[in-house]
Amino acid sequence: MAVPKRKMSRANTRMRRSQWKAQAPKLVKTVENGKVSYSLPHQAKLVSDSAGTPLFYEYKGRKVADA
């Protein structure tokens, strides 16, 4: 296993770590009943009635779980 010969300075350590970036999530735009919503892909969607009461979860057009 490689071992550093000298201690890395704070400035160099922080400079190296500043390159670590989190990627923004890729959202999918869906239009339902005239409302636009954004969600993560490959996740079950909550289906609700007109009053806003949650009914069930849906994935790829199939019911997968009760709400």
From Swiss-Prot:
The keyword Ribonucleoprotein applies. GO terms for molecular function: structural constituent of ribosome. The keyword Ribosomal protein applies. Disulfide bonds: none annotated. GO terms for cellular component: large ribosomal subunit. GO terms for biological process: translation. Residues 1-22 are annotated as: Disordered. Keywords: Ribonucleoprotein, Ribosomal protein. It comes from the Bacteria. Pfam families: Ribosomal_L32p (PF01783). InterPro entries: Ribosomal_bL32, Ribosomal_zn-bd. Residues 1-19 have a biased composition (Basic residues). Belongs to the bacterial ribosomal protein bL32 family. This is Large ribosomal subunit protein bL32. It comes from Kocuria rhizophila (strain ATCC 9341 / DSM 348 / NBRC 103217 / DC2201).
